[in-house]
Amino acid sequence: MTAQTLYDKLWNSHVVREEADGTALLYIDRHLVHEVTSPQAFEGLKLAGRRLWRVDSVVSTADHNTPTDHWDQGIQDPISRQQVETLDANIKAFGALAYFPFKDKGQGIVHVMGPEQGATLPGMTVVCGDSHTSTHGAFGALAHGIGTSEVEHVMATQCLVAKKSKNMLVRVDGRLGAGITAKDVALAIIGKIGTAGGTGYAIEFGGEAIRGLSMEGRMTLCNMAIEGGARSGMVAVDDKTIEYVKGRPFAPKGEQWNQAVAYWNTLHSDDGAHFDQVVALDAADIQPQVTWGTSPEMVAEVGGKVPNPANESDPVKKAGIERALAYMGLEADTPIEQIPVDVVFIGSCTNSRIEDLREAAAVAKGRSKAGNVKQVLVVPGSGLVKAQAEAEGLDKIFVAAGFEWREPGCSMCLAMNADRLLPGERCASTSNRNFEGRQGQGGRTHLVSPAMAAAAAVAGRFVDVRRLAAG
């Protein structure tokens, strides 16, 4: 039998039909739904007189538009309120069973609450009208974002028209140094391959450093796969995967659990499986990362400098650097550690899980927000994460440091709710995109890990968190 990659196995087990040109009909196991990309899809079903093909495949929540403070006042913005209320009405009308509405204890960012509910299982195909659906590949699943018209198609047919991607292996060899996180690994990979490096590929992350990551770290890594241009990212199933899933509400029980585990243990690339491209990094070389520009590939080590466009021979790249520096208000050759910050955001589907909050709290403990920092938002990824953090006393650490402890939601990851930057404000953010205007018109975003974000909050500028940890 021909050796298969993990992606090959996941793809082949879900193909319903394949045409000669490679176009395939792919069966979808899990459909995650939120309030932003679902209204048009539900409306299309209504107009056509269709129903949800598999009600039990849909898991939904409100996240993008929900406020993260003053929940007692409801949703103030009328457009945001309309989107959330429309989701409420559509879920009721179509009889979807698994819904975590605004203020529900299980509500949260769809890519956080889905896995913690066990709605994401190894071997599944998972889709959502959201580009960071690649997060769920951390479980040995085939997961990717889809457009609004595709959301309707999956709702109506439980299938998706797709073409198979090529296979890429990104291998991180060796062990990560102290203070180096999954976010640093993700940014280092994107810095190496670029934001188009994974275009046309499904990326499997492997190597000793990846196996050493927790499930939460793997979710962070796979979340960022799309920022490297890939359709999806994934990690092979191991004992950590199975232990994470065990006992969660949507996980199999009894004999079905035993059968599932037996299958899940096959979800890894076979020896000798062919990858169309292999990229290797040495874990020992990865340092804390900070983006300086307007794309995740514009990234440097914290001990480095902002690049000088005069040193770039490619005229297109040179122009890109010049434009990014102008937007970001930075001078060439500025040391990263001399860049001050105005706002810090710790949250998003990339870095709002309990492990992320613990890392940030470890830095904040016994310290205070720097005087030049206007605001530090700490936004848990779900109601369950919030409850766990409060049970551990993390909220008290943040508040004592002058940080704001908020309710769950997408928050300042994108300017779609009340949490946003003002023009010219510079933010150390644990989110996944630093595009122009992403966090608010004229806002300047630097992507970092939770620990690095907390370090910037107390130092007032970017600083190597490992120095703070050393005392």
From Swiss-Prot:
Its EC number is 4.2.1.33. [4Fe-4S] cluster binds at residues 349, 410, 413. It catalyses: (2R,3S)-3-isopropylmalate = (2S)-2-isopropylmalate. Its cofactor is [4Fe-4S] cluster. SUPFAM superfamilies: Aconitase iron-sulfur domain. Pathway: Amino-acid biosynthesis; L-leucine biosynthesis; L-leucine from 3-methyl-2-oxobutanoate: step 2/4. One of its GO terms (biological process) is L-leucine biosynthetic process. One of its GO terms (molecular function) is 4 iron, 4 sulfur cluster binding. It is an enzyme of class 4 (lyase). The keyword Iron applies. It comes from the Bacteria. Keywords: 4Fe-4S, Amino-acid biosynthesis, Branched-chain amino acid biosynthesis, Iron, Iron-sulfur, Leucine biosynthesis, Lyase, Metal-binding. Binds 1 [4Fe-4S] cluster per subunit. NCBIfam families: leuC, PRK05478.1, PRK12466.1. Belongs to the aconitase/IPM isomerase family. LeuC type 1 subfamily. Heterodimer of LeuC and LeuD. Catalyzes the isomerization between 2-isopropylmalate and 3-isopropylmalate, via the formation of 2-isopropylmaleate. This is 3-isopropylmalate dehydratase large subunit.
